[in-house]
Protein backbone atom coordinates (compact mmCIF):
# COMPACT_ATOMS: atom_id res chain seq x y z
CA UNK A 1 0.00 0.00 0.00
CA UNK A 2 1.37 3.43 -0.96
CA UNK A 3 2.35 5.74 1.90
CA UNK A 4 1.95 8.78 -0.34
CA UNK A 5 -0.75 11.22 0.68
CA UNK A 6 -3.33 11.78 -2.03
CA UNK A 7 -4.20 15.46 -1.74
CA UNK A 8 -6.72 15.29 -4.59
CA UNK A 9 -10.45 14.96 -5.07
CA UNK A 10 -12.18 11.95 -6.63
CA UNK A 11 -11.66 13.43 -10.12
CA UNK A 12 -7.90 13.55 -9.57
CA UNK A 13 -7.84 17.32 -9.16
CA UNK A 14 -5.12 18.77 -6.97
CA UNK A 15 -6.00 21.32 -4.30
CA UNK A 16 -5.08 24.71 -5.72
CA UNK A 17 -3.93 27.64 -3.62
CA UNK A 18 -5.35 30.28 -5.93
CA UNK A 19 -4.30 33.35 -3.99
CA UNK A 20 -3.10 34.43 -0.56
CA UNK A 21 -3.26 37.77 1.20
CA UNK A 22 -2.56 39.32 4.57
CA UNK A 23 -2.74 42.60 6.36
CA UNK A 24 0.51 44.21 7.37
CA UNK A 25 1.55 42.85 10.77
CA UNK A 26 1.74 45.45 13.53
CA UNK A 27 3.24 45.42 17.00
CA UNK A 28 0.79 45.47 19.89
CA UNK A 29 -0.93 48.80 20.52
CA UNK A 30 0.38 50.47 17.36
CA UNK A 31 -1.33 50.66 13.95
CA UNK A 32 -4.16 48.23 14.80
CA UNK A 33 -4.75 49.49 18.34
CA UNK A 34 -8.49 49.09 18.96
CA UNK A 35 -9.05 46.95 15.85
CA UNK A 36 -10.36 43.48 16.72
CA UNK A 37 -9.27 40.20 15.16
CA UNK A 38 -12.75 39.94 13.65
CA UNK A 39 -12.44 43.34 11.97
CA UNK A 40 -9.01 42.45 10.59
CA UNK A 41 -10.37 39.10 9.39
CA UNK A 42 -13.22 40.80 7.52
CA UNK A 43 -10.77 43.33 6.14
CA UNK A 44 -8.44 40.73 4.60
CA UNK A 45 -11.21 38.43 3.31
CA UNK A 46 -12.99 41.37 1.68
CA UNK A 47 -9.78 42.42 -0.03
CA UNK A 48 -9.00 38.84 -1.09
CA UNK A 49 -12.41 38.58 -2.75
CA UNK A 50 -11.94 41.95 -4.42
CA UNK A 51 -8.52 41.09 -5.82
CA UNK A 52 -9.68 37.69 -7.05
CA UNK A 53 -12.71 39.32 -8.72
CA UNK A 54 -14.73 36.39 -7.40
CA UNK A 55 -18.37 36.85 -6.47
CA UNK A 56 -18.54 36.34 -2.67
CA UNK A 57 -21.57 34.13 -3.21
CA UNK A 58 -19.32 31.59 -4.99
CA UNK A 59 -17.60 30.79 -1.68
CA UNK A 60 -18.99 27.51 -0.37
CA UNK A 61 -17.05 27.28 2.88
CA UNK A 62 -15.00 29.54 5.13
CA UNK A 63 -12.86 28.11 7.93
CA UNK A 64 -11.12 30.70 10.05
CA UNK A 65 -9.19 30.70 13.28
CA UNK A 66 -8.32 32.80 16.27
CA UNK A 67 -6.15 31.96 19.29
CA UNK A 68 -7.04 34.81 21.65
CA UNK A 69 -10.81 34.35 21.57
CA UNK A 70 -13.38 37.15 21.58
CA UNK A 71 -16.20 36.23 23.99
CA UNK A 72 -18.53 38.60 22.12
CA UNK A 73 -17.99 36.75 18.81
CA UNK A 74 -16.74 33.23 19.50
CA UNK A 75 -17.40 31.99 15.93
CA UNK A 76 -15.19 34.43 14.03
CA UNK A 77 -15.69 32.51 10.77
CA UNK A 78 -19.46 32.95 10.80
CA UNK A 79 -19.14 36.66 11.53
CA UNK A 80 -16.74 37.07 8.59
CA UNK A 81 -19.26 35.39 6.28
CA UNK A 82 -21.99 37.74 7.48
CA UNK A 83 -19.73 40.77 7.05
CA UNK A 84 -18.31 40.14 3.58
CA UNK A 85 -21.30 39.65 1.29
CA UNK A 86 -21.25 35.87 1.11
CA UNK A 87 -24.45 33.85 1.08
CA UNK A 88 -25.89 33.57 4.57
CA UNK A 89 -26.02 29.81 3.92
CA UNK A 90 -22.24 29.60 3.40
CA UNK A 91 -20.75 26.92 5.64
CA UNK A 92 -18.49 28.56 8.22
CA UNK A 93 -16.80 27.42 11.39
CA UNK A 94 -13.86 28.44 13.55
CA UNK A 95 -10.80 26.47 14.59
CA UNK A 96 -7.89 26.92 16.95
CA UNK A 97 -4.58 25.05 17.07
CA UNK A 98 -2.44 27.70 18.77
CA UNK A 99 0.23 29.03 16.39
CA UNK A 100 -0.66 26.36 13.80
CA UNK A 101 -4.27 27.55 13.58
CA UNK A 102 -4.30 28.68 9.95
CA UNK A 103 -2.46 25.53 8.90
CA UNK A 104 -5.47 23.74 10.38
CA UNK A 105 -8.05 25.96 8.69
CA UNK A 106 -6.26 25.48 5.34
CA UNK A 107 -6.24 21.71 5.76
CA UNK A 108 -9.92 21.69 6.73
CA UNK A 109 -10.94 23.52 3.57
CA UNK A 110 -8.60 21.36 1.48
CA UNK A 111 -10.18 18.21 2.91
CA UNK A 112 -13.66 19.54 2.11
CA UNK A 113 -12.52 19.93 -1.50
CA UNK A 114 -10.90 16.47 -1.46
CA UNK A 115 -14.16 14.84 -0.36
CA UNK A 116 -16.12 16.66 -3.05
CA UNK A 117 -18.30 18.57 -0.59
CA UNK A 118 -17.13 21.92 -1.99
CA UNK A 119 -15.01 23.29 -4.82
CA UNK A 120 -14.24 26.77 -3.52
CA UNK A 121 -13.33 27.85 0.01
CA UNK A 122 -11.39 30.37 2.06
CA UNK A 123 -9.14 29.61 5.05
CA UNK A 124 -7.13 31.80 7.36
CA UNK A 125 -6.70 33.28 10.79
CA UNK A 126 -6.45 36.53 12.71
CA UNK A 127 -5.35 37.65 16.14
CA UNK A 128 -5.21 40.88 18.06
CA UNK A 129 -2.97 41.45 21.05
CA UNK A 130 -4.34 44.99 21.30
CA UNK A 131 -8.03 44.09 21.71
CA UNK A 132 -7.96 41.53 24.49
CA UNK A 133 -10.68 39.75 26.49
CA UNK A 134 -9.77 41.17 29.89
CA UNK A 135 -11.30 38.94 32.54
CA UNK A 136 -11.95 39.01 36.27
CA UNK A 137 -10.56 36.99 39.15
CA UNK A 138 -12.07 33.59 39.93
CA UNK A 139 -13.30 34.90 43.27
CA UNK A 140 -15.05 37.88 41.66
CA UNK A 141 -16.54 35.69 38.93
CA UNK A 142 -17.92 33.33 41.58
CA UNK A 143 -19.34 36.28 43.52
CA UNK A 144 -20.99 37.78 40.43
CA UNK A 145 -22.84 34.52 39.80
CA UNK A 146 -23.94 34.41 43.43
CA UNK A 147 -25.06 38.06 43.27
CA UNK A 148 -27.25 37.22 40.30
CA UNK A 149 -29.02 34.61 42.42
CA UNK A 150 -29.23 36.65 45.63
CA UNK A 151 -32.59 38.24 46.42
CA UNK A 152 -32.29 40.35 49.55
CA UNK A 153 -29.91 43.23 50.27
CA UNK A 154 -28.48 41.25 53.16
CA UNK A 155 -27.61 38.30 50.92
CA UNK A 156 -25.96 40.61 48.39
CA UNK A 157 -23.99 42.49 51.05
CA UNK A 158 -22.69 39.23 52.51
CA UNK A 159 -21.40 38.22 49.08
CA UNK A 160 -19.72 41.59 48.48
CA UNK A 161 -17.98 41.44 51.88
CA UNK A 162 -16.19 38.26 50.79
CA UNK A 163 -14.21 40.24 48.23
CA UNK A 164 -10.91 41.99 48.79
CA UNK A 165 -9.42 44.78 46.70
CA UNK A 166 -7.11 42.36 44.85
CA UNK A 167 -10.16 40.35 43.77
CA UNK A 168 -11.41 43.39 41.84
CA UNK A 169 -8.29 43.72 39.67
CA UNK A 170 -8.69 42.85 35.94
CA UNK A 171 -7.12 39.61 34.74
CA UNK A 172 -5.44 39.67 31.29
CA UNK A 173 -5.36 36.54 29.10
CA UNK A 174 -2.87 33.93 30.28
CA UNK A 175 0.48 33.83 28.51
CA UNK A 176 1.43 30.51 30.07
CA UNK A 177 0.58 26.92 29.22
CA UNK A 178 -2.49 25.86 31.18
CA UNK A 179 -1.04 22.43 32.00
CA UNK A 180 2.48 23.51 32.99
CA UNK A 181 2.36 27.20 33.88
CA UNK A 182 5.35 27.77 31.57
CA UNK A 183 5.33 30.67 29.13
CA UNK A 184 6.56 30.27 25.56
CA UNK A 185 9.60 32.38 26.46
CA UNK A 186 10.48 30.10 29.36
CA UNK A 187 10.21 27.14 27.00
CA UNK A 188 12.51 28.87 24.51
CA UNK A 189 14.96 29.40 27.35
CA UNK A 190 14.73 25.69 28.17
CA UNK A 191 15.56 24.86 24.56
CA UNK A 192 18.53 27.22 24.46
CA UNK A 193 20.00 25.41 27.45
CA UNK A 194 19.09 21.87 26.28
CA UNK A 195 20.68 22.34 22.86
CA UNK A 196 23.54 24.65 23.95
CA UNK A 197 22.41 27.49 21.74
CA UNK A 198 24.45 30.60 22.37
CA UNK A 199 23.19 34.14 22.75
CA UNK A 200 25.42 35.13 19.82
CA UNK A 201 23.81 32.57 17.50
CA UNK A 202 20.33 33.68 18.52
CA UNK A 203 21.14 37.32 17.92
CA UNK A 204 22.73 36.47 14.56
CA UNK A 205 19.59 34.67 13.39
CA UNK A 206 17.40 37.59 14.47
CA UNK A 207 19.68 40.03 12.66
CA UNK A 208 19.53 37.85 9.52
CA UNK A 209 15.74 37.76 9.68
CA UNK A 210 15.37 41.53 9.99
CA UNK A 211 17.96 42.20 7.30
CA UNK A 212 16.31 39.84 4.79
CA UNK A 213 12.82 41.15 5.59
CA UNK A 214 14.00 44.71 4.99
CA UNK A 215 15.54 43.73 1.65
CA UNK A 216 12.35 41.87 0.72
CA UNK A 217 10.11 44.85 1.43
CA UNK A 218 12.48 47.23 -0.35
CA UNK A 219 12.50 44.95 -3.42
CA UNK A 220 8.70 45.11 -3.66
CA UNK A 221 8.27 41.32 -3.48
CA UNK A 222 5.56 41.52 -0.81
CA UNK A 223 3.38 44.20 -2.38
CA UNK A 224 1.00 41.72 -4.01
CA UNK A 225 0.52 39.62 -0.88
CA UNK A 226 0.20 42.38 1.74
CA UNK A 227 -2.76 44.75 1.49
CA UNK A 228 -2.94 48.38 2.52
CA UNK A 229 -5.07 48.44 5.66
CA UNK A 230 -7.15 51.53 6.39
CA UNK A 231 -7.79 51.68 10.10
CA UNK A 232 -11.00 53.06 11.67
CA UNK A 233 -11.82 55.94 11.91
CA UNK A 234 -10.03 55.87 8.52
CA UNK A 235 -7.70 58.78 9.14
CA UNK A 236 -4.62 56.55 8.88
CA UNK A 237 -3.41 53.42 7.14
CA UNK A 238 -0.63 50.85 7.38
CA UNK A 239 1.00 49.34 4.31
CA UNK A 240 4.11 47.68 5.75
CA UNK A 241 4.96 45.45 8.72
CA UNK A 242 6.12 47.73 11.52
CA UNK A 243 8.17 45.33 13.62
CA UNK A 244 11.05 45.08 11.14
CA UNK A 245 14.31 46.71 12.23
CA UNK A 246 15.18 48.35 8.94
CA UNK A 247 18.64 49.39 10.12
CA UNK A 248 19.41 46.22 12.05
CA UNK A 249 22.91 46.19 13.54
CA UNK A 250 24.17 42.98 15.09
CA UNK A 251 26.02 44.88 17.81
CA UNK A 252 22.79 46.40 19.09
CA UNK A 253 21.29 42.99 19.96
CA UNK A 254 23.91 42.37 22.64
CA UNK A 255 22.72 45.39 24.62
CA UNK A 256 19.42 43.80 25.68
CA UNK A 257 19.05 41.89 28.93
CA UNK A 258 17.60 38.35 29.01
CA UNK A 259 13.82 38.46 29.37
CA UNK A 260 12.97 35.13 31.00
CA UNK A 261 16.05 34.11 32.99
CA UNK A 262 17.67 37.34 34.12
CA UNK A 263 20.79 35.70 35.53
CA UNK A 264 21.68 32.88 33.16
CA UNK A 265 19.35 33.40 30.19
CA UNK A 266 19.95 34.19 26.54
CA UNK A 267 16.42 34.77 25.18
CA UNK A 268 15.74 38.49 24.80
CA UNK A 269 13.05 40.71 23.34
CA UNK A 270 15.27 41.20 20.29
CA UNK A 271 15.62 37.50 19.46
CA UNK A 272 11.93 36.72 20.10
CA UNK A 273 8.75 37.61 18.24
CA UNK A 274 6.74 40.46 19.74
CA UNK A 275 3.02 40.46 20.47
CA UNK A 276 1.50 41.26 17.08
CA UNK A 277 -1.81 42.13 15.41
CA UNK A 278 -2.76 40.90 11.95
CA UNK A 279 -4.84 38.66 9.70
CA UNK A 280 -4.28 36.45 6.66
CA UNK A 281 -6.29 34.25 4.29
CA UNK A 282 -5.95 31.93 1.30
CA UNK A 283 -8.41 31.14 -1.48
CA UNK A 284 -8.55 27.40 -2.26
CA UNK A 285 -10.22 25.59 -5.16
CA UNK A 286 -10.17 22.28 -6.94
CA UNK A 287 -7.65 22.46 -9.77
CA UNK A 288 -10.24 22.10 -12.54
CA UNK A 289 -12.51 24.78 -11.05
CA UNK A 290 -9.60 27.20 -10.69
CA UNK A 291 -8.56 26.71 -14.30
CA UNK A 292 -12.14 26.91 -15.57
CA UNK A 293 -12.43 30.31 -13.88
CA UNK A 294 -9.19 31.45 -15.50
CA UNK A 295 -6.95 31.52 -12.44
CA UNK A 296 -3.26 30.67 -12.34
CA UNK A 297 -2.81 29.17 -8.85
CA UNK A 298 0.21 30.24 -6.83
CA UNK A 299 0.64 26.63 -5.71
CA UNK A 300 -0.83 23.23 -4.90
CA UNK A 301 -0.87 21.31 -1.61
CA UNK A 302 1.28 18.20 -1.95
CA UNK A 303 1.17 16.88 1.63
CA UNK A 304 0.62 17.97 5.22
CA UNK A 305 1.07 16.65 8.74
CA UNK A 306 0.49 17.62 12.35
CA UNK A 307 2.35 16.42 15.44
CA UNK A 308 2.17 16.58 19.23
CA UNK A 309 4.78 16.02 21.94
CA UNK A 310 5.02 16.39 25.71
CA UNK A 311 4.68 19.94 27.04
CA UNK A 312 7.01 19.85 30.02
CA UNK A 313 10.35 20.01 28.21
CA UNK A 314 11.29 21.71 24.93
CA UNK A 315 7.73 21.65 23.61
CA UNK A 316 8.40 23.96 20.64
CA UNK A 317 10.02 21.17 18.60
CA UNK A 318 6.96 20.73 16.38
CA UNK A 319 8.77 21.23 13.03
CA UNK A 320 11.18 18.40 13.85
CA UNK A 321 8.27 15.99 14.32
CA UNK A 322 5.77 17.20 11.70
CA UNK A 323 8.25 17.77 8.85
CA UNK A 324 9.43 14.15 8.44
CA UNK A 325 5.79 13.04 8.34
CA UNK A 326 4.95 15.54 5.60
CA UNK A 327 8.09 14.59 3.65
CA UNK A 328 7.26 10.89 3.86
CA UNK A 329 3.69 11.52 2.71
CA UNK A 330 5.05 13.50 -0.25
CA UNK A 331 7.63 10.82 -1.10
CA UNK A 332 10.43 13.34 -0.61
CA UNK A 333 13.56 14.04 1.40
CA UNK A 334 14.59 17.41 2.81
CA UNK A 335 17.24 17.90 0.12
CA UNK A 336 14.52 17.65 -2.56
CA UNK A 337 12.93 20.90 -1.38
CA UNK A 338 13.52 24.16 -3.20
CA UNK A 339 12.65 26.42 -0.24
CA UNK A 340 11.97 26.03 3.48
CA UNK A 341 9.82 28.39 5.54
CA UNK A 342 10.01 27.75 9.29
CA UNK A 343 8.13 29.87 11.81
CA UNK A 344 10.61 31.76 13.97
CA UNK A 345 8.76 32.11 17.27
CA UNK A 346 12.11 32.52 19.00
CA UNK A 347 15.62 32.32 17.62
CA UNK A 348 16.38 29.63 20.22
CA UNK A 349 13.41 27.50 19.12
CA UNK A 350 14.31 27.89 15.44
CA UNK A 351 17.97 26.98 15.97
CA UNK A 352 17.02 23.99 18.15
CA UNK A 353 14.82 22.61 15.39
CA UNK A 354 17.47 23.23 12.75
CA UNK A 355 19.96 21.38 14.91
CA UNK A 356 17.64 18.39 15.35
CA UNK A 357 16.88 18.25 11.62
CA UNK A 358 20.56 17.36 11.17
CA UNK A 359 20.81 14.99 14.16
CA UNK A 360 21.03 11.25 13.49
CA UNK A 361 20.66 10.63 17.23
CA UNK A 362 17.40 12.60 17.39
CA UNK A 363 16.11 10.84 14.28
CA UNK A 364 16.79 7.41 15.72
CA UNK A 365 15.66 8.00 19.31
CA UNK A 366 12.67 10.32 18.75
CA UNK A 367 11.50 9.60 15.22
CA UNK A 368 12.47 5.96 14.70
CA UNK A 369 14.32 6.88 11.51
CA UNK A 370 17.55 5.41 10.20
CA UNK A 371 18.77 8.78 8.97
CA UNK A 372 18.50 12.40 10.01
CA UNK A 373 15.79 14.57 8.50
CA UNK A 374 18.62 16.48 6.88
CA UNK A 375 20.89 19.45 7.31
CA UNK A 376 19.20 22.69 6.33
CA UNK A 377 20.78 24.59 3.45
CA UNK A 378 20.68 28.23 4.55
CA UNK A 379 20.37 29.38 0.94
CA UNK A 380 16.90 27.77 0.99
CA UNK A 381 15.87 28.73 4.52
CA UNK A 382 13.57 31.68 5.31
CA UNK A 383 15.05 33.51 2.35
CA UNK A 384 12.74 36.50 2.79
CA UNK A 385 13.22 36.76 6.54
CA UNK A 386 10.92 35.19 9.12
CA UNK A 387 8.58 35.76 12.01
CA UNK A 388 11.30 37.34 14.14
CA UNK A 389 11.10 40.27 11.73
CA UNK A 390 7.55 40.19 10.40
CA UNK A 391 5.90 39.48 13.75
CA UNK A 392 3.53 36.74 14.84
CA UNK A 393 -0.26 37.27 15.10
CA UNK A 394 -0.78 33.70 16.31
CA UNK A 395 -3.60 32.47 14.06
CA UNK A 396 -2.42 34.42 11.01
CA UNK A 397 1.11 33.03 10.77
CA UNK A 398 0.31 29.72 9.05
CA UNK A 399 -1.32 31.21 5.98
CA UNK A 400 1.37 33.92 5.91
CA UNK A 401 4.01 31.17 5.63
CA UNK A 402 2.05 29.21 3.00
CA UNK A 403 1.42 32.27 0.82
CA UNK A 404 4.96 33.55 1.15
CA UNK A 405 6.66 30.29 0.17
CA UNK A 406 4.29 29.77 -2.77
CA UNK A 407 4.79 33.25 -4.15
CA UNK A 408 8.56 33.11 -3.77
CA UNK A 409 8.68 29.74 -5.53
CA UNK A 410 6.54 31.20 -8.32
CA UNK A 411 8.92 34.14 -8.62
CA UNK A 412 11.86 31.72 -8.91
CA UNK A 413 10.22 29.63 -11.60
CA UNK A 414 8.60 26.90 -9.50
CA UNK A 415 9.62 24.01 -7.27
CA UNK A 416 8.56 22.53 -3.96
CA UNK A 417 8.50 24.24 -0.60
CA UNK A 418 8.00 23.41 3.06
CA UNK A 419 6.06 25.61 5.47
CA UNK A 420 6.33 24.46 9.09
CA UNK A 421 5.62 25.79 12.57
CA UNK A 422 5.78 24.96 16.24
CA UNK A 423 2.78 25.74 18.43
CA UNK A 424 1.82 25.92 22.08
CA UNK A 425 0.70 22.65 23.62
CA UNK A 426 3.65 20.79 22.10
CA UNK A 427 2.02 20.94 18.67
CA UNK A 428 3.60 21.09 15.24
CA UNK A 429 2.46 21.56 11.65
CA UNK A 430 4.09 21.06 8.26
CA UNK A 431 2.84 21.46 4.70
CA UNK A 432 4.60 20.80 1.42
CA UNK A 433 3.49 22.80 -1.59
CA UNK A 434 4.38 22.46 -5.26
CA UNK A 435 4.52 25.41 -7.61
CA UNK A 436 4.62 25.40 -11.41
Swiss-Prot record:
Transferase found in the keyword field: yes
GO molecular function terms noted in the UniProt entry: acetyl-CoA C-acyltransferase activity
Reactions accelerated catalytically: an acyl-CoA + acetyl-CoA = a 3-oxoacyl-CoA + CoA
Example of a GO biological process term: fatty acid beta-oxidation
EC number: 2.3.1.16
Subcellular location: Cytoplasm
Signal peptide range in chain numbering: none
Enzyme superclass (EC): transferase
Organism domain of life: Bacteria
Gene3D superfamilies the UniProt entry points to: 3.40.47.10
Record-linked Pfam families: Thiolase_C, Thiolase_N
GO cellular component, one term: cytosol
Subunit structure: Heterotetramer of two alpha chains (FadJ) and two beta chains (FadI).
Family that this chain belongs to: Belongs to the thiolase-like superfamily. Thiolase family.
The protein's name in its UniProt record: 3-ketoacyl-CoA thiolase
Recorded name of the encoding gene: fadI
Amino acid sequence: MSELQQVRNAKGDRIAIVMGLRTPFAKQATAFHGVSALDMGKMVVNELLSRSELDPKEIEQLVYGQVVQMPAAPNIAREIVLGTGMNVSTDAYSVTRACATSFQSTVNVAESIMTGNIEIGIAGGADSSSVLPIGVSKKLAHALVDLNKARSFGQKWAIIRRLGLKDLLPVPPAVAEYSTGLSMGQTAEQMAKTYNISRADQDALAHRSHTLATETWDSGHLRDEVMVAHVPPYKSFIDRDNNIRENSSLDSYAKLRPAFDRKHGSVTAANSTPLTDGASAVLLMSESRAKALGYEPIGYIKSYAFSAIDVWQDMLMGPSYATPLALKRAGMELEDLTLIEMHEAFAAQTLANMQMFASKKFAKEKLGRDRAIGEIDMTKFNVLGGSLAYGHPFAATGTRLITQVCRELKRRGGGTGLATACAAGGLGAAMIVEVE
